[in-house]
Amino acid sequence: MSTPAIQWYPGHIAKAEQQLSRHLDKVDLVIEVRDARIPLATGHPHLDRWLKGKQHLMVINRRDMVTPAAREAWEAWFKGRGQRTVWCDAKAGTGVKQVQQAAIRAGDHLNERRRNRGMRPRPVRALTLG
């Protein structure tokens, strides 16, 4: 006799994806946090499709857990794909200021676009996930 397949996992994921999609419609900037030890495995394969052209800042945390050579290789890999990244170690506070500055720059860019279209600047709505 075979064991029955677990059915709660796909439904759980589908529900979370629907909720995320609703939240993404309301934000200007998505700050995605990934693990430096496995940066590809800690990203969602459908995130680019969900972003629909929104500004995206990738924060790679736990930079202290990888060698400088590995960090440089990953940085080059992401840069080659047009993805801006900020490396940090949230536990030690290293790189957190750079994350803040990158988010502020993204907000400035958003408000510049709003001004060019005759709209007033407003606070940036950001979503952090990962």
Predicted features and spans:
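N-terminal accessory targeting/assembly segments
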Residues: 1-52
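Short, contiguous strand/loop micro-motifs
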Residues: 7, 61-62
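Active-site flanking residues adjacent to catalytic metal/cofactor-binding acidic residues
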Residues: 34, 60-61
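Canonical P-loop GTPase G-domain recognition
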Residues: 57, 63-129
